[in-house]
């Protein structure tokens, strides 16, 4: 394994483009300049006198927020204005490539006043210009791109004391298309530019006319790379600065792959497998051999049914995460990040139809509710009506998610989000992990035709952000989730020796209610100790879950032939049951992100949790358990050259066992520890990112049978998971995007009183890989035509750890074709093109997956 790591590291270093030094031009504070009397050349000279080197270095450490982008029509074309709230200094590097004029602005980010990132795009704003985009190129750089239809557009650069940086873009229809040439500056052309590239020279500003018009905010991100994420640190941290593997599946990948079950997005991440359950409804994802924890916008969530109607991106943090999120398995967590309100209007409608009577419609509306744009909203609504390749499965799902954000002041905002889900679902429990079931038709459902699962959820999320000053801010959030379920579910039972008869089919169900409460408060401070920079996070979390189940259960009379099924057998009911449980978690955590040197960063933190659990049947005295655990994490990142990050980390996790020994003593929580080292790289001018990780996880204190009394448990079991992973995502060349992964994993029982040592963990393949790539034609008559293809390989794996059935490996092949023009898009997605037969599993059951399916989508944006 180490040999493979060294070879992979060598490969990544070899393919990295040589680091290029670029000349940077600083723009002075806006209030110090006079747009009407100074040219760019003159105020560049002024900057050299006013900003000595030490001041410049100080500014470079601060990321300037550009809070708005506007476009004003002019007699030449259009002016694009990047507005800052405090008039801070900005830097610019201009170049041209092909038909594109490109400006990079280091130490700057597009951020709404509430801190959310945003993207701007205008299609065909003027004659001769096909597109203007303003995006966060990476975690510390804004990129402005102006694409010409026939050649490089003519762009001039100004600064305004009242507005910000201004890019004047000339129309090809303008009589003043060719500007008067200005004297060349003495600054050399940045190294690394092609011979045909040139640095655009500034001229006097053009006159403004008419009323300002704002560029349209792009509601959907169109990149495969995301430069930063909050899951790993609870702060917006560049992925390259995190000493743990974290992968982000952005909205564009979800859209290109035609994903309708949001957990399918994790197929693109190394070391993950889907663990289906309850008719492919439960969204359990195995990460590095363990069940993952689930978050929704950073709050603990249940994986039972996850609607993707308002999901912006999916973040997968690998390894233990108890340091910030409390009790969880050591493999990792999945965070579903929802869409936020935007300051400019954006409206989208999606209509999807597919095989097996699949129909889904969705709308996404956002924009301001007030003229001053202090009150913003977003509304996501979707409706799905679908059949299935499995018998007796019909689904009817309504999802509504409104969000409102109010900017109380420059330093305070409040967001109120609500989600409503009503799902009436057919039910499918799959079959037992027995090889005979692998030969039955894929459509066979052992459940009864009248089995059902009804779900109703209400989720309320209130978030407050307050900035005391530039160095201290508060974030506080409260979540309430109400879950109501009712069901009638058939259990498949065991198969007789004849390989075809089920004699012990049973059923269960009944109403279930759960109320979830969660409160998180984080205080984030930035300060220095000498030359060392700190970002300190102090947080408190409290959450409670109350659940009550009123169960019905029984058995079916007679036998069931899986090759000649007969449904409608009489049910013999058992007495009704009642079960209730309450879990209360209180956690306090501290984290410090330390910049020792510009290229050397330390992450250290710890969390202490108190967990109370009680359960009962409403008649006898409840069973109670009290646990506490401390979960530390420490990691370091070293960046020898700008594109490369070398990292190492140690992290830990815990899970309460809620059991007692024969002597009556409670079992200690199971503990997980991980050691991880890796390399992160940003290639092709930061358009492509790669992560190579090697890890070793040990989980201890696992309950296993007491050899002296088999009615009780002792916590001496141990399992291990170790492996190597590679993830790649980004844009190789204009229009050609890729997301790929590969991994080797060895997850096995290392100590147990019941299971043999070396037994593989359930649903943990020894190897897997994925590749999805798309290409969209960038110019010419076919501009907007896109094609995509994907391969998803999963190695063989154990379906059940007690009586192992090996599920065969498979390679699923997908493809897509799309056409995008102006504000509409049409797409066809082909899934499982070669109609292979493959399976997903959880710890107890196996589920056949869909054959070849065709799905078509029409999307319109306004």
Model-assigned labels for residue ranges:
Residues 465-469, 473-479, 483-491, 671-731, ...:
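Membrane-embedded beta-barrel scaffold of Gram-negative outer-membrane proteins
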Residues 715-801, 837, 857-861:
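Gram-negative outer-membrane beta-barrel transporters
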């Amino acid at each position: 394994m180490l040999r493979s790591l060294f070879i992979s590291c060598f490969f990544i270093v070899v393919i990295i483009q040589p680091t290029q030094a670029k000349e940077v031009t600083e723009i002075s504070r806006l209030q110090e300049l006079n747009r009407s009397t100074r040219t760019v050349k003159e105020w560049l000279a002024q900057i050299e006198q006013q900003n000595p080197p030490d001041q410049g270095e100080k500014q470079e450490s601060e990321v300037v927020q550009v809070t708005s982008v506007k476009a004003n029509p002019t007699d030449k074309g259009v002016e694009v204005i990047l507005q800052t709230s405090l008039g801070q200094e900005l830097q610019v590097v201009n170049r041209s490539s092909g038909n594109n004029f490109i400006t990079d602005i280091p130490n700057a980010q597009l951020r709404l006043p509430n801190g959310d990132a945003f993207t701007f795009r205008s299609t065909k704003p003027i004659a001769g210009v096909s597109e203007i985009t303003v995006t966060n190129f990476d975690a510390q750089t804004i990129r402005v791109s102006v694409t010409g239809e026939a050649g490089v557009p003519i762009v001039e650069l100004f600064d305004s004391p009242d507005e910000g940086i201004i890019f004047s873009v000339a129309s090809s229809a303008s009589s003043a298309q060719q500007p008067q040439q200005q004297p060349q500056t003495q600054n050399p052309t940045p190294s690394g530019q092609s011979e045909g590239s040139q640095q655009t020279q500034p001229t006097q500003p053009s006159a403004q006319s008419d009323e300002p018009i704002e560029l349209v905010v792009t509601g959907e991100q169109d990149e495969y790379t995301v430069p930063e994420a909050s899951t790993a640190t609870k702060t917006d941290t560049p992925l390259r600065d995190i000493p743990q593997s974290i992968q982000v599946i952005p909205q564009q990948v979800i859209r290109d792959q035609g994903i309708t079950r949001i957990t399918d997005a994790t197929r693109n991440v190394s070391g993950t497998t889907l663990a289906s359950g309850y008719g492919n409804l439960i969204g359990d994802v195995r990460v590095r051999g363990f069940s993952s924890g689930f978050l929704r916008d950073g709050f603990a969530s249940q994986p039972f049914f996850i609607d993707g109607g308002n999901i912006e991106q999916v973040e997968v943090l690998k390894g233990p995460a108890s340091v910030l999120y409390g009790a969880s398995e050591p493999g990792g967590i999945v965070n579903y990040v929802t869409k936020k309100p935007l300051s400019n209007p954006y409206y989208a409608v999606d209509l999807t139809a597919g095989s097996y009577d699949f129909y889904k419609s969705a709308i996404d509306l956002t924009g301001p509710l007030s003229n001053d744009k202090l009150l913003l909203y977003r509304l996501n609504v979707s409706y799905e009506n679908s059949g299935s390749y499995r018998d007796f499965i019909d689904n009817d799902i309504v999802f509504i998610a409104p969000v409102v954000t109010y900017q109380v002041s420059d330093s305070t905002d409040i967001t109120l989000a609500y989600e409503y889900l009503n799902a009436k679902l057919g039910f499918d429990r799959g079959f037992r992990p027995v090889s005979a079931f692998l030969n039955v038709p894929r459509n066979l459902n052992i459940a009864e035709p009248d089995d059902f699962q009804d779900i109703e959820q209400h989720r309320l999320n209130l978030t407050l952000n307050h900035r005391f000053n530039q160095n201290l801010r508060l974030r506080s959030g409260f979540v309430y989730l109400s879950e109501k379920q009712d069901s009638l579910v058939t259990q498949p039972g065991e198969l007789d020796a004849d390989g075809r008869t089920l004699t012990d089919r049973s059923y269960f169900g009944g109403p279930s209610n759960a109320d979830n409460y969660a409160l998180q408060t984080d205080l984030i401070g930035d300060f220095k100790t000498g030359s060392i920079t700190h970002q300190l996070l102090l947080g408190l979390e409290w959450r409670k879950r109350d659940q009550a189940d009123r169960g019905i259960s029984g058995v079916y009379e007679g036998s069931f032939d899986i090759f000649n099924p007969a449904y409608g057998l009489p049910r013999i009911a058992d007495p009704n049951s009642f079960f209730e449980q309450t879990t209360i978690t209180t956690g306090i955590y501290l984290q410090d992100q330390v910049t020792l040197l510009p290229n050397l960063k330390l992450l250290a933190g710890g969390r202490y949790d108190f967990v109370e659990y009680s359960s009962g049947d409403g008649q006898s005295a409840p069973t109670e358990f009290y646990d506490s655990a401390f979960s530390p994490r420490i990691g370091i990142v070293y960046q020898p050259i700008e594109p490369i990050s070398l990292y190492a980390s140690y992290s830990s996790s815990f899970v309460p066992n809620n059991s007692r020994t024969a002597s009556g003593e409670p079992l200690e929580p199971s503990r997980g520890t991980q050691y991880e080292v890796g390399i992160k790289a940003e290639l092709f001018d930061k358009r492509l990112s790669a992560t190579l990780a090697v890890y070793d996880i040990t989980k201890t204190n696992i309950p296993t049978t007491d050899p002296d009394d088999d009615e009780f448990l002792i916590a001496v079991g141990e399992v291990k998971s170790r492996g190597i992973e590679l993830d790649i995502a980004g844009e190789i060349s204009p229009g050609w995007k890729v997301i790929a992964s590969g991994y080797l994993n060895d997850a096995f029982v290392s100590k147990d009183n019941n299971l043999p040592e070396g037994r593989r963990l359930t649903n943990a393949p020894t190897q897997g890989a994925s590749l999805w790539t798309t290409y969209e034609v960038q110019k010419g008559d076919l501009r907007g035509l896109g094609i995509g293809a994907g391969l998803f390989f999963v190695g063989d794996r154990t379906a059940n750890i007690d009586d192992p059935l090996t599920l065969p490996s498979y390679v699923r092949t997908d493809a897509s074709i799309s056409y995008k023009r102006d504000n509409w898009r049409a797409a066809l997605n082909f899934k499982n093109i070669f109609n292979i037969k493959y399976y997903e599993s959880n710890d107890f059951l196996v589920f056949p997956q869909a054959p070849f399916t065709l799905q078509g989508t029409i999307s319109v944006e306004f």
